[in-house]
Amino acid sequence: MSRSLKKGPFVAESLIKKIEEMNEKGEKKVIKTWSRSSTIFPQMLGHTIAVHDGRKHVPVYISEDMVGHKLGEFVLTRTFKGHVDKTEKGTRVK
């Protein structure tokens, strides 16, 4: 289900505040955030935001195609290491 139009999109206040301050100063530093559920706004274009994946912060450069999506969509939280292969004898090889 999508969010109600009367509520508007969610963006963490601390994140939007940092973006606005950097836009006023003309800076382009990496911003760390744990807010994966924040919606990407047009004001964020050109910035690099380090989004937490549960273990580390992964830098994400914001482009035009990302506007309207959530930050968490661009940072995976799980790593797939592949299925285990079997040898001729039936023992597993990693």
UniProtKB/Swiss-Prot annotation:
Pfam families: Ribosomal_S19
Entry annotated with the keyword Ribosomal protein: yes
GO annotation terms (biological process): ribosomal small subunit assembly; translation
GO molecular function, one term: structural constituent of ribosome
A GO CC term attached to the entry: small ribosomal subunit
Key words, A-Z: Ribonucleoprotein, Ribosomal protein, RNA-binding, rRNA-binding
Family per record: Belongs to the universal ribosomal protein uS19 family.
Function: Protein S19 forms a complex with S13 that binds strongly to the 16S ribosomal RNA.
PANTHER family in the cross-refs: RIBOSOMAL PROTEIN S19P FAMILY MEMBER, SMALL RIBOSOMAL SUBUNIT PROTEIN US19M
Protein name (database record): Small ribosomal subunit protein uS19
Biological source species: Clostridium novyi (strain NT)
